[in-house]
């Protein structure tokens, strides 16, 4: 961790090249639910912690609790960036929490705070949409990647495959977020999108 912090500092060039200290939280229970954790803080602040990993807990709520404490103690910002949601086997955008409990306002508010953007494309494929959920979109099959979330669901019924695809891709969840805003007063899926190499 100290090497990551030192490298970020070494390559930082104010006004020319911005670096962030960060790491990957790699939860894998039931499907890949990976998040990049990015800190805005100084080396002193980020160096005061040991990153919270999926070895401590696979539940993102536990990660967010750890990061909330960090924010309160340091005064710095931190975000988590979901990525490879296409490989989540429907786990990333489930209709309940990791512990299979109903969503609460507090849960949705915390998720909104920590996840303002998601990665929708990278070399492991596209997380924007899927041909099963966007059959009329000629680009829905673009960059499916070497491993698709539905490879794990090949023996499932078409309805289950569609459900898993909807819970793994950004375009579907944007609609879900609008409905959640009506129900809960908060939209946890109002996010920007990024692409990575």
Where are the model-predicted features located?
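Extended, charged catalytic domains and RNA/DNA-binding interfaces, predominantly
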Residues: 1-197
